[in-house]
């Protein structure tokens, strides 16, 4: 799957140069933007785990090594930020204390790469006795009461399970 992304981009570049009638002297640049899967509440994939930090990093490394053409540029979200996104997307009330402690450690403008300090977030989790992987990397069972199960979001649990099963069957 991962290598196939870059292979497809290379085919686009190759097709451009094989196209007759294209303007000569012009170059092509294909930008490949990839996103890490982040399970979100109220979706059929809320039950799925996110890849671990190490798995995400490995996929990014495969992508980087697979790009051999200067005609292809690669963009992706930082692994540590994706992990935190999954943690807070599927988290519960206990994360409030983690947020507060991270804030006290200076985590305020984390959407800016130069202001993001993953190590401070990990310290805050440790101080609170919480493991980010419990939230991000754990498969949830269909009968688990989720932190957002009490909310009415207009879609039934049965519908989400049905859509999840259809997606796995590629329907």
Predicted features along the sequence, with ranges:
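Short catalytic/ligand-binding loop motif for oxyanion handling, primarily in non-cytosolic enzymes
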Residues: 40-43, 83-85
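Conserved C-terminal portion of the radical SAM core fold
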Residues: 1-41, 55-79
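Short secondary-structure boundary/capping segments
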Residues: 1-6, 45-56, 88-95
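Glycine- and acidic
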Residues: 42-49, 141-146
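Generic detector of isolated residues embedded in canonical secondary-structure elements
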Residues: 31, 51, 158-159
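Radical SAM enzyme core and accessory elements
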Residues: 64, 68-171
């Amino acid at each position: 799957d991962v290598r196939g992304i870059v292979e497809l981009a290379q085919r686009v570049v190759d097709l451009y140069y094989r196209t007759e009638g294209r303007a000569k002297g012009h170059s092509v640049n294909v930008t490949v933007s990839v996103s890490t899967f982040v399970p979100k509440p109220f979706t059929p994939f809320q039950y799925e785990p996110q890849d671990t930090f190490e798995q995400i990093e490995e996929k990014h490394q495969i992508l980087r090594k697979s790009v051999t053409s200067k005609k292809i540029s690669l963009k992706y979200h930082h692994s540590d930020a994706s992990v935190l996104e999954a943690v807070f997307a599927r988290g519960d009330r206990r994360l409030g204390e983690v947020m507060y402690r991270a804030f006290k450690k200076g985590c305020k403008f984390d959407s800016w790469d130069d202001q993001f300090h993953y190590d401070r977030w990990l310290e805050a989790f440790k101080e609170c006795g919480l493991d980010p992987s419990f939230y991000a990397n754990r498969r949830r069972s269909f009968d688990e009461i989720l932190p957002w199960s009490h909310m009415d979001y207009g879609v039934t649990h049965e519908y989400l399970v049905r859509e999840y099963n259809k997606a796995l069957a590629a329907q």
